[in-house]
Amino acid sequence: MSIATEIIGVPETLDHFQSESFSPYHFFSSEQWAKFRADTPLTLTSDEVKRLRSMGDPIDLDEVRRIYLSLSRLLSAHVESSQLLFEQRNRFLSLSDVTKTPFVIGIAGSVAVGKSTTARILKELLGRWPSSPKVDLITTDGFLHPNAVLQREKLMQRKGFPESYDTAAILRFLSAIKAGRPDVQAPCYSHLVYDVLPDEYKIVDRPDILIFEGINVLQSRDLPADGKIVPMVSDFFDFSIYIDAAEDQIHNWYVTRFMRLRETAFRDPNSYFHRYASISDAEALEIAADLWTNINLKNLRQNILPTRPRADLILKKGKDHLIEQVALRKL
């Protein structure tokens, strides 16, 4: 099924609905998208890309050339337009000595789909623009409720679902960022101990660009019955990206990553998942499949995939973890 059909949600037999004129997106193959790079310089080395990519993600310098340089150029245009609008509004309001608030980029997608790699690659590319902007990266992991809270509320098996996050804290953080406040605290998370680290924070001090990455960042909220105003996390985004792939592919990537972690991080006695390091491969495969089916697949279908049409840009991956198609929202 084509990305156009999936986004619109109609059968492929309805060819007239696949026309771009009936879609809010422009669609490009990776080869077409690569041509939009123009003269954007390649500022990363092969070794740097290897350092930035997540376990199991084969992204290389060629993929950066094909996909990310064009994306960097596009984001540069959006940031420049935002700066121009900021200046025009200040003139309209007769304001002076006003500091522009950060340009916020949201990145969403399933677990194991490659969000973190995309976020880290973009952080480096954007920070190396000629204007040398200050770029920060924050993930939503730190905004999960602590395990003690999840255990008390019987939500440990729902970790990663919307109710497992402190959404109010996310909104306070993004509101402070968009208000232009200095030294905003973002809670830290440890994948080793699988928990929020108490009293540990990353300080975000008025960056030019903030990348905010997590599975839940494009999700909407139920409107309260009392009529109170409820902001959405995505209300604070200037641009949003969804990393997409077929379910069976993400399943394979998730299981492969789980098995590799058994040979690496899980062997650390301090790891929350240390118990999985000593079981048989067959047992590990069964556990990984169960975790995928009963937790991550459900979350993908119920809460993550439905947010895809809300993204400004959709990067669709193929079975080799490399991006095959790009959808860009029309203006």
Swiss-Prot record:
Its main location: cytoplasm. It is an enzyme of class 2 (transferase). It is found in: Cytoplasm. CDD domains: PanK. It catalyses: (R)-pantothenate + ATP = (R)-4'-phosphopantothenate + ADP + H(+). Pfam families: PRK. GO terms for cellular component: cytoplasm. One of its GO terms (biological process) is coenzyme A biosynthetic process. Pathway: Cofactor biosynthesis; coenzyme A biosynthesis; CoA from (R)-pantothenate: step 1/5. ATP binds at G109, S110, V111, A112, V113, G114, K115, S116. Its EC number is 2.7.1.33. Keywords: ATP-binding, Coenzyme A biosynthesis, Cytoplasm, Kinase, Nucleotide-binding, Transferase. Gene3D superfamilies: P-loop containing nucleotide triphosphate hydrolases (3.40.50.300). InterPro entries: P-loop_NTPase, PanK, PRK/URK. GO terms for molecular function: ATP binding; pantothenate kinase activity. HAMAP family: Pantothen_kinase_1. PANTHER family: URIDINE KINASE (PTHR10285). Belongs to the prokaryotic pantothenate kinase family. This is Pantothenate kinase. It comes from Rhizobium etli (strain CIAT 652). The lineage of its organism: Bacteria, Pseudomonadati, Pseudomonadota, Alphaproteobacteria, Hyphomicrobiales. The gene is coaA.
